[in-house]
Amino acid sequence: MNIEDKIPDLVWTKELNCGITVCDGYGNIIYMNDKAILLKHGNLTGKNIFECHNPDSCRIIRHLLETGGQHIYTIEKNGIHKLLYQSAWKEKGIIQGLCEIMVELSEPIPHFIR
């Protein structure tokens, strides 16, 4: 059973114009939306997130899974700037895994003070 069957409300993320990857508390990828599959060059569902990252990234991911925290940063890859938001996801206050949202950024990014 895939996560969309378990959580029918997740269906709205399937065609969202940002990459969404979700893993369980052991780092097993349990969901990728269409954009994440495209950005990662294939469906990694069933693979372990720790096999896809370097040791520094794995350390950060483990920390997020232990503390329930978040990590926000930008990268540039092949000339494309991306914002990455990683956050532990919880159920009834208990950490269940990690969610990563990847957004391709336009140049320049408007910044407003409100």
What do these predicted regions represent?
Residues M1-D34:
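Sensory modules in modular signal-transduction proteins
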Residues Y26, Y31, K35-R114:
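Sensory/regulatory domains in signal-transduction proteins
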